[in-house]
Each structure stands twice: as C-alpha cells, then as structure tokens.
From Swiss-Prot:
Assembly and interaction partners: Complex I is composed of 45 different subunits.
Principal subcellular localization: mitochondrion
Source organism of the structure: Caenorhabditis elegans
Protein name: Probable NADH dehydrogenase [ubiquinone] 1 beta subcomplex subunit 2, mitochondrial
Membrane topology (UniProt): Peripheral membrane protein
Lipid metabolism keyword on record: no
Record-linked PANTHER family: NADH DEHYDROGENASE [UBIQUINONE] 1 BETA SUBCOMPLEX SUBUNIT 2, MITOCHONDRIAL, NADH-UBIQUINONE OXIDOREDUCTASE AGGG SUBUNIT
Localization of this protein: Mitochondrion inner membrane
Any one of the GO BP annotations: mitochondrial respiratory chain complex I assembly
Family statement drawn from the similarity comment of this UniProt entry: Belongs to the complex I NDUFB2 subunit family.
Entries under Pfam families matching the protein: NADH_B2
InterPro entries per UniProt: NDUFB2_animal (IPR026627)
Gene: ndub-2
Gene Ontology CC: mitochondrial inner membrane; mitochondrion; respiratory chain complex I
Amino acid sequence: MLGNKFVAQLALQHLRNRGLVNSPSRLTFVRNRFAWGSDAVGPNVPVGGKMGASENPELHTYDGDYRGTISKGDKPIPDYFYRTPTTGRTYIDRCVTYFISAVIWAWFSYHMYYHSGHLLGHWYMPYLSEFTDEELGIPKDSAEDPEYWGNHKKEYGTYR
C-alpha cells in the first residue's frame, strides 16, 4: 500500500501540472490563482430536467427527464431555473406517499389486532368468562335488592 507521504507528493505533483499550485515548497488548500472561462471547467453535473452535460452524449441522457404528470394536476416543471422555486408535490410524490402510508397503517392495524403484545408489551389477557361476579360488580343472587332501582314513579326530568 502507498504511504501517506507518497500520496501527498503525488497529489502535489498533479496539482502543479494543472497549474493550481504555484508554490513548489508547500501544499495548501487555497488556490493561488482564479480560474476564468475555459479554465473553470468542473465536473459534469445534472442541470435542469436533463442529466449530464449537453456536449457529452453518454452523460446527457433523457433517463432523468421528468417534468411532472400534467394530466394528474401537476404544474409543469421548467427545464432550467435561475433559482429553484418550490414546485409542490408531483403525482409520483403523492402516489409514493400514499402507498407508504397505506403500508404503514396496514402493518400497524394488523399488529394491533393480532399481535398487540409486540407493540404494547406482553401480559396475560383473561377471557371474559374467567372474571368473577364480584370482580365485575355483580351482586350475589341471595343479596338484598338495592333500595333505589330507578325513577319509575316520577315524571321525566324531575329526578335530576
């Protein structure tokens, strides 16, 4: 494997060959001269609705050309922007959002119904037939009737 010193010297030599570093004795991260015109050539980056630089047919493809689905109510996205505005959500964004939210809600509903212990913790959940009358607040059959069972003999609205 190459040593760090060798890699630094190789990088310095490469920068000297391109004319980005004038000083032969030290390597700095600040450019010593400005690049103008054809000297200021950078990497080919996506611009506008198309991908890659227009002079390079390998990078300038129409694979990434999407301007919205106008038939579904989207505003058309222009080719180029001076400053990129917020164009709103496109049809694809809405479809993907609805699909992901439907999957999440389906998963949550299924697990809350069938496997609620995974989400809320595990504990014993008795059947309703396992509860006693005392736990449910039902008096014994041999117990006296309560004194007050309702307002059968009073007019409606006078007993509140």
